[in-house]
Amino acid sequence: MEAEVINQLNNTLNDLEKRSEDIRVYMDYQGKKDRLEEVIGLSEDPELWNDPKRAQEIGKERKILEGIVLTLDNIATGIEDNRMLIEMTVEENDEEGFAAVQEDVAGLEKQMADLEFKRMFNQPADPNNCFIDITAGAGGTEAEDWAGMLFRMYSRYAERKGFKIEILEEDDGEIAGINRATIRVEGEYAYGLLRTETGVHRLVRYSPFDSNNKRHTSFASVFVYPEIDDSIEIEINPADLRIDTYRASGAGGQHINKTDSAVRITHEPTGIVVQCQNDRSQHANKAAAMEMLKSKLYELEMRKRNEEKQALEEGKSDVGWGSQIRSYVLDSSRIKDLRTGYEVGNTKAVLDGDLDGFIEASLKQGV
């Protein structure tokens, strides 16, 4: 074993120790550890399960806290253990054992990188589930097909992350794709990961719907907003709501059109409209639509609060509904984020849900 390799491994452990100390301060390790002990106590109380919703919230909080506290504990233990193992394997000239130490240290680096990535989740709702609204722009079939491609892209991304998805509303295009859709994404940090996808997505390709095989440009809008729980109070005056029922359209089985089970709620002071047609029950669809409305009102309030701050940040683009954020040029095999400059050539992989590079770049640059 070369001295340079041994020194490099020891330096890696020293670097990990310093990064671990920094992130313990930044993430308030002791505060989270104390809270984890409280949450474990709450979760072991048999009476908690009399309130399933509260039990679910406690379970979610416990998982998030354990992901930070136990990972930092594991890294600290791993650093000390591997320092001793380096000494032992060097003394015994145990190359196989030394290789195992190198592999274990690489695993610790991966855990640290994952924690450092979570530092970028700095909004209160980042750990929450989220909703994604996808709407085709002008252009008929071309735009509707593009909206359908985005629908699939985000569905595949969610599957890759092990998230659950639920289609709450889907309006099929006349020939292909969708006119609009809303999906719910359930998973740890779903909103934090996906929130920077809000904006207008532009597609340039040779159209499969054009017999002359001309190049077409299509647009679709994406809006991501967090699912909020009872810890965030959103007051809604029933007098501000207009509630309409209608027969659902789109995918969902033959039963979906037999009754007026779909629900549309309009919040008249803001003009926000939410729709749900996922369930046979009008009552269930109304409840789901109300949750979507609460989430949209929360997102609207958060955007208002951040408006002044964003205006002062030089070079920071407006990520509102009307802003173009990403260009997908398929015939040139190029997808580029217009805010961060991040670009890839494997268009097929991106449209199949490989969005990690784009999301990491946008979070690091704070778009």
Swiss-Prot record:
Sites bearing N5-methylglutamine, chain numbering: 254
Coarse class of the protein's main subcellular location: cytoplasm
Compartments, record wording: Cytoplasm
InterPro entries referenced in this protein's UniProt entry, alphabetically: PCRF, Pep_chain_release_fac_I, Pep_chain_release_fac_I_sf, PrfB
SMART domains the record matches: PCRF
A Pfam family: PCRF
Keywords carried by this UniProt record: Cytoplasm, Methylation, Protein biosynthesis
Free-text description of this protein's post-translational modifications in UniProt: Methylated by PrmC. Methylation increases the termination efficiency of RF2.
GO MF annotations, alphabetized: translation release factor activity, codon specific
GO cellular component: cytoplasm
Keyword Endoplasmic reticulum carried by entry: no
UniProt record similarity statement: Belongs to the prokaryotic/mitochondrial release factor family.
PANTHER family: CLASS I PEPTIDE CHAIN RELEASE FACTOR (PTHR43116:SF3), PEPTIDE CHAIN RELEASE FACTOR 2 (PTHR43116)
Function of the protein: Peptide chain release factor 2 directs the termination of translation in response to the peptide chain termination codons UGA and UAA.
The name this protein goes by in its record: Peptide chain release factor 2
Organism: Neisseria meningitidis serogroup A / serotype 4A (strain DSM 15465 / Z2491)
Organism phylogeny: Bacteria, Pseudomonadati, Pseudomonadota, Betaproteobacteria, Neisseriales
Gene: prfB
